[in-house]
Amino acid sequence: MTELAGASSSCCHRPAGRGAMQSVLHHFQRLRGREGGSHFINTSSPRGEAKMSITSDEVNFLVYRYLQESGFSHSAFTFGIESHISQSNINGTLVPPAALISILQKGLQYVEAEISINEDGTVFDGRPIESLSLIDAVMPDVVQTRQQAFREKLAQQQASAAAAAAAATAAATAATTTSAGVSHQNPSKNREATVNGEENRAHSVNNHAKPMEIDGEVEIPSSKATVLRGHESEVFICAWNPVSDLLASGSGDSTARIWNLNENSNGGSTQLVLRHCIREGGHDVPSNKDVTSLDWNTNGTLLATGSYDGFARIWTEDGNLASTLGQHKGPIFALKWNRKGNYILSAGVDKTTIIWDAHTGEAKQQFPFHSAPALDVDWQNNTTFASCSTDMCIHVCRLGCDRPVKTFQGHTNEVNAIKWDPSGMLLASCSDDMTLKIWSMKQEVCIHDLQAHNKEIYTIKWSPTGPATSNPNSNIMLASASFDSTVRLWDIERGVCTHTLTKHQEPVYSVAFSPDGKYLASGSFDKCVHIWNTQSGNLVHSYRGTGGIFEVCWNARGDKVGASASDGSVCVLDLRK
């Protein structure tokens, strides 16, 4: 049968930008209608035996989930809004991962079966199952065309077999009259042909792409990996508590969870389930929306979460809901505490950013400066922050100011992530335009325009080294993760790439430095977490999980790495000797 890449929850990838979605949006435009209402589509098989009804809401939801699972976060948000996913009555927690891929695969198998069956219901004699690509299967008259091609090939094979039989009979007759010396030469030639034929077949079988084999010397043994299960959908994010071994995770099952991995916890790891609910008819009911962002405050006493339901929430470390923050008019994409712990900053698909008072839960100020969804935010200090958007702009805003104090323009596609360096002097940004740019508040244009990746750059991280860090004697570095399957380390002072890390085989969605800056963790949709030496660029540890990796993070001591995955699992890697 046909094998689809991504038949599991680890789906294939394409660029996360808006351009990658145009064909999908166009294809389903007729089903949604301009207002995104639900329509019924009556379908039947080509021969008219079976009929069924499919609503456009159902189609839209499966496409939306596929985009999320594939890592197309920006496109998923846009598509969800345009198709009014939030207004549908579909309970997303009941839909299994990779549902769209699964139903497409079943459709392919149905077409393959049709090709193998005659009009009268009998199976072609000796016919192998025909392997199709998805594009082959949607072509007009594919069944009739493939059946006709098979009949012609079968006729040729029968004619060739008859000719070969006649030739063999003639050769056998001639062999009885030839000399013994000549007859001894032929078997050697025949044996050589047989051996070469087997070699050729073996070569063709082994010529398929395989997952990279992990070197046994760097592979993290299963005894050092703890797999935490409990989430019922993909886990988009995870973050360690800054003072203890509590790992928070956020999922498409509308929950966040706090996993206790402290050595003194009884019975191994335990989990607290933080259910994200909304008020309906005087009752709290599950929101059925993804938890898209989370962040611990500096002293580790409070956890903030952002959800696709448009609400930010503050939780205590023991799992109690402390506050619900509601002013965004759509999904929340990013959320950050300031260092002091008195404000929370959020970015929304409603094109705004909001500073919240963490104590009262009130919005201190809303900043409506972007012309498209805001994708990321980062604090420069306790009252000043930067935000980026699909509008290709970066704004630097300050609490109390009614306009941006600085606007950086230069990217030619949506800006995916922004990060201030530890000193707050330099701002790094990465974009779907495949560039990494470094900005200074002292000038209008970027001070570095770094162009080395050949696909979209999804995220960036500064090392915790250099001035204003606990590792002042180590040089500062910047790491970038791209859809080209590579991670790059940069010397920002010189504006050069010092290492290109190339072991991943799928887009890389997350990178994180160890607290001392000596190691870098990377997570990719190839299901692998790699640990690299930042000085040499060498791979020192590697782990292959069971789902595509969305996020990686280090605990405060630097001896454990957490990773969240598309199959609903959360992995904890113990790097102690």
UniProtKB/Swiss-Prot annotation:
Q: Which parts of the sequence belong to the LisH domain?
A: 55-87
Q: What is the effect of changing F77A?
A: Abolished homotetramerization, leading to a homodimer
- In this UniProt entry, the residues modified to Phosphoserine are S183
What ranges does the record give for the region Disordered, renumbered to this chain?
177-202
An example GO BP is: negative regulation of transcription by RNA polymerase II
Modification sites for N6-acetyllysine: K153
The effect annotated for N416Y is: In CHNG8; uncertain significance; decreased protein expression
F-box-like domain: which residues?
92-137
Q: Main site of residence? A: nucleus
Superkingdom, natural source: Eukaryota
Name its cellular compartments. Answer: Nucleus
Annotated WD repeat ranges: 230-269, 286-325, 327-366, 369-409, 410-449, 452-500, 503-542, 544-576
Tell me yes or no: is Coiled coil among this UniProt entry's keywords: no
Q: State which tissues express it.
A: Ubiquitous.
> May I have one GO cellular component term?
transcription repressor complex
Q: Where is this cross-link: Glycyl lysine isopeptide (Lys-Gly) (interchain with G-Cter in SUMO2)?
A: K340
**What clinical condition does the entry mention?**
Hypothyroidism, congenital, non-goitrous, 8: A form of central hypothyroidism, a disorder characterized by sub-optimal thyroid hormone secretion, due to insufficient stimulation by the thyroid stimulating hormone of an otherwise normal thyroid gland. It may be caused by congenital or acquired disorders of the pituitary gland or hypothalamus. CHNG8 is a congenital, X-linked, relatively mild form which may be accompanied by hearing loss in some patients.
Q: Which protein is depicted?
A: F-box-like/WD repeat-containing protein TBL1X
